[in-house]
Structure formats: C-alpha cells, structure tokens
C-alpha cells in the first residue's frame, strides 16, 4: 500500500489496468557449466568459474523485475554475479558465450552490469560520483512498502535479502528491514528491469536488496523483446529466482507486517505462540 499522503498512480501498479506478468523462469538455453533444476527456478554452475550465462525464459514486460537470490558461493575465484538485459533471442545463441562480459556484450544489443561488493550505484545526472557511491539505507517497509523506479511501483518486501537471525549482531537493527547484506553475499537479492521512455527507448535499472542503483544503461530498444541475463560467475555458484507480488500486497504479507510492528527484532518472534512455519515466514526464512 502506498503512503497515505501520496496518491497512487494507478498506471504504475500491476493488476489494475494491466495483467500481472507470469512467474519468471530460466531459459532452456544457458552456459555449458550451468544446470537448471526441473522447476526452472534454480541455476547452479557445476564446475570452473565461467560458462555460467543464463537467460530468462520469456522476454520481460516493462517494469517486471527478474529477481534472483544468491544461494551458494564458491571460494577461490575473483569476481561476482553479473546482471543485465539482451535483445538477442537466447534460442539463437549456439553456443552460449563463455562470459557475459565482454563476450555476450560484444555480440551487440546486450547490456550487462558487473555486481561488486561496493559502489554499485550509478551517478545521477548533475550529482557527483562520491554522492552516488555513499552508502544509504532505504526506507523501511512500514514507512514505504513500494520502491518507486521511474513510472513503476514495485512491492519492496521480497526485494530485500536478509541473513539468518542470530549469525551477526548487526542483524538486530530495528525491524530487521535495513539493507545489511553486502550485494555479493549469500542470500542477497538482485534484480533487473527496464523502464520505457517517451522517445521509444528504455532505461535498464539494477535493484540490490531493495535499493535502485539508478539507470545502469540508457537507450535500450523498448519495442524489441528484452531478456534478462544472469551470469553465475566466479565466486557466485548458485542462484534461485524470487517471485514478486505485484499490485497490492497479499493478506499474508500484510499480516506479517502487523506482527513485525510489535517486535523489537527477529529473534523476539521465536517467543510468540505461533506455528513454526508462520514464525519462519515472519523472519523471512
């Protein structure tokens, strides 16, 4: 739900004037070292550090987020996940390039962003790079449950990756909604989407744990099918897709927010007289 003081732009919400997009899946075409599970929602690189390029099964709709969570890491490699969009049909790629950067990009009509542990934010026009690189904390879910990117509103709840409670003391931040995970950490959530512009082009945006990193690329062909690109590269070994709730939050999500309002931190949820499955849901486990 949008804040009471801010009117909702109905054209920016799914389910009001346009149908919600179908669930995201990985394409059957992928790098030689990738194995996709039968559900099409988990991609794992089984050897080496390369040949890990994956694609979305279908082209993305405007404003649709292709969101992945890092499930497994592998020590000994230098580099991390890469994320982006391509206007190339994955079915036409034989073989799939070894790397998204630079191999796939060099084929043209492809835009890929290398995720790093720090400094993923893109400087805005008229603002210094130092300001863009400065760490920031996004509004909490209870204050602003939507992430606004250009003309789109995206429910923030599932965009944010969270570590398991009890592992680190800093996870006791108020309401455990703050962005405490490094972008390349296990359980971090990263997404890509495109936003059409009036001139017929589109901007590509990268989302990291609920924060918009700004337009990572401009001038994309909005009229052409755009597929998501996920390069399970180097220290990133396995990712899974996360499905978003578009439009209004579900009753389940709203109930979780009500429970969280009365909690000091996640560990306090264990003391509630609730079924374990519900406690885990409230703790994002």
Swiss-Prot record:
| Tissue/organ expression | Expressed specifically in skeletal and cardiac muscles.
Q: Which UniProt keywords apply?
A: Cytoplasm, Ubl conjugation pathway
Region entry Disordered, spans: 1-20
GO CC list: cytosol
Instruction: Give the highest taxon in the source lineage.
Output: Eukaryota
| Domain annotation NHR: ranges | 23-244
Query: Has UniProt tagged this entry with the keyword Cytoplasm?
Result: yes
Q: Which InterPro entries match?
A: B30.2/SPRY_sf, Neuralized, NHR_dom, SOCS_box, SOCS_box-like_dom_sf
Gene Ontology terms describing biological process: intracellular signal transduction; protein ubiquitination
Q: Which GO terms describe its molecular function?
A: ubiquitin protein ligase activity
Q: Where in the cell is it found?
A: Cytoplasm
Establish whether keyword Cytoplasm is in the entry.
Answer: yes
Q: What is known of its domains?
A: The SOCS domain mediates the interaction with ELOB and ELOC, while the NHR domain may be involved in ubiquitination substrate binding.
Subunit composition? Answer: Probable component the ECS(NEURL2) E3 ubiquitin-protein ligase complex consisting of ELOB/Elongin B, ELOC/Elongin C, CUL5, RBX1 and NEURL2. Interacts with CTNNB1.
- Identification of the protein by name: Neuralized-like protein 2
């Amino acid at each position: 739900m949008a804040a009471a003081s801010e009117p909702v732009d109905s054209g920016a919400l799914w389910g009001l004037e346009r149908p919600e997009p179908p669930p995201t899946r990985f394409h059957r075409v992928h790098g030689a070292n990738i194995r996709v599970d039968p559900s099409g929602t988990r991609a794992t690189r089984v050897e080496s550090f390369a040949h890990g390029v994956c694609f979305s099964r279908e082209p993305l709709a405007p404003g649709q987020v292709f969101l992945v969570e890092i499930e497994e890491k592998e020590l000994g490699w230098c580099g991390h996940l890469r994320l982006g969009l391509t206007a190339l049909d994955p079915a036409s790629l034989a073989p799939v390039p070894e790397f998204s950067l630079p191999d796939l990009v060099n084929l043209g009509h492809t835009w890929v962003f290398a995720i790093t542990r720090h400094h993923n934010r893109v400087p805005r026009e008229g603002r210094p790079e130092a300001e863009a690189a400065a760490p920031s904390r996004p509004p909490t879910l209870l204050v602003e449950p939507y992430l606004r990117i250009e003309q789109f509103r995206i429910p923030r709840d599932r965009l944010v990756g969270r570590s398991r409670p009890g592992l680190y003391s800093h996870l006791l931040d108020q309401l455990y909604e703050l962005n405490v995970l490094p972008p390349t950490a296990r359980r971090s959530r990263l997404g890509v989407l495109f936003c059409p512009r009036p001139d017929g082009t589109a901007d590509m945006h990268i989302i990291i744990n609920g924060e918009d990193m700004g337009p990572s690329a401009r001038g994309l062909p909005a009229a052409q099918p755009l597929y998501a690109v996920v390069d399970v590269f180097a220290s990133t070994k396995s990712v899974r897709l996360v499905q978003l709730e578009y439009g209004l939050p579900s009753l389940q999500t709203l109930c979780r927010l009500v429970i969280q309002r009365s909690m000091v931190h996640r560990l306090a949820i264990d003391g509630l007289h609730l079924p374990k499955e519900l406690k885990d849901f409230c703790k994002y486990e």
